[in-house]
């Protein structure tokens, strides 16, 4: 049987994803367990983290396991990922050794590695994550690269709790771009689009212009998913029409893909769309929609204080669910 990783939810069946969510709910009610007793996980961070690191470390501990944190280039050697390269630069060891050696020590490996933001053609290959999965003899978990599947499941769990049902089919779901002074990763948006269409919601991707539409891979996944579920998917640049009648507003900022490596040119374009902020007037157009965001969030830039502090905001609950879904993921993979 092939080794199963958790790289993207699109790689898992709906029944497998539902089983993870069921287990996450069980862990939420019973915090401690022994599903990882005698097991260990290496958490490899190429980029900073607050929620991801704390929730993975605590999750492993609560299930009787042990987590170690490695930061290549800081407290561990810089790693080379190119094949066939003559390693005369700054990197000290190659991923083909790193992943294999870690696999001798631990039972799971988590990887967090953001895009370099210089060339999307390169970044979309997700080389760091896929290299770990290629060479590792143990399961690999995506802790955010160009997708963020752990956030996906925490998001869906929070929506299910809010609506009081595991069946989200037919909900009008708006994934809206929001302004940020910096160009950000598309990972959460890619994942939100994937899971919302996968679970049968009617999805609108709202963004300022065609330049801000997500990568064709995730658009294709969305179209494949709605073909399977009978739901709908559309791209919109009209704020009022997108918000009108929505049941879910999920906000995220990201940089325009055509401008990767040329952000100075993209900045004045992005600055024109500060009005995409999620505010009370836009939320008033919805069907009393629930609002969420993956966090961190710049208040009164991405969303107003009133929206963030309102009773329909579930961002904190979503973040809290990261602990439970990641415990479910670790437990499932460690049992192989």
Curated annotation (Swiss-Prot):
One Pfam entry name: OTCace
InterPro entries membership: ArgF, Asp/Orn_carbamoyltranf_P-bd, Asp/Orn_carbamoylTrfase, Asp/Orn_carbamoylTrfase_sf, Asp_carbamoyltransf_Asp/Orn-bd
GO cellular component terms, semicolon-separated: cytoplasm
Record bears the keyword Cytoplasm: yes
Site-annotated residues for Key residue in conferring substrate specificity for N-acetyl-L-ornithine versus N-succinyl-L-ornithine: 92
A molecular function GO annotation: amino acid binding
Enzyme Commission numbers on file: 2.1.3.9
Domain of life: Bacteria
Modified residues (N6-carboxylysine): 302
Keywords of the record: Amino-acid biosynthesis, Arginine biosynthesis, Cytoplasm, Transferase
Gene Ontology terms describing biological process: arginine biosynthetic process via ornithine; citrulline biosynthetic process; L-arginine biosynthetic process
Pathway assignment: Amino-acid biosynthesis; L-arginine biosynthesis
Binding, N(2)-acetyl-L-ornithine: 144, 252, 295
Catalytic activity: N(2)-acetyl-L-ornithine + carbamoyl phosphate = N(2)-acetyl-L-citrulline + phosphate + H(+)
Keyword Amino-acid biosynthesis among UniProt keywords: yes
Modes of activity regulation: Carboxylation at Lys-302 increases the catalytic activity of the enzyme.
Binding site for carbamoyl phosphate: 49-52, 77, 112, 148-151, 294-295, 322
Family: Belongs to the aspartate/ornithine carbamoyltransferase superfamily. AOTCase family.
Subunit structure: Homotrimer.
Annotated function: Catalyzes the transfer of the carbamoyl group from carbamoyl phosphate to the delta-amino group of N(2)-acetyl-L-ornithine to produce N(2)-acetyl-L-citrulline. This is a step in an alternative arginine biosynthesis pathway. The enzyme has no activity with ornithine.
Protein name stated in the entry: N-acetylornithine carbamoyltransferase
Origin organism lineage: Bacteria, Pseudomonadati, Pseudomonadota, Gammaproteobacteria, Lysobacterales
GN (gene name): argF'
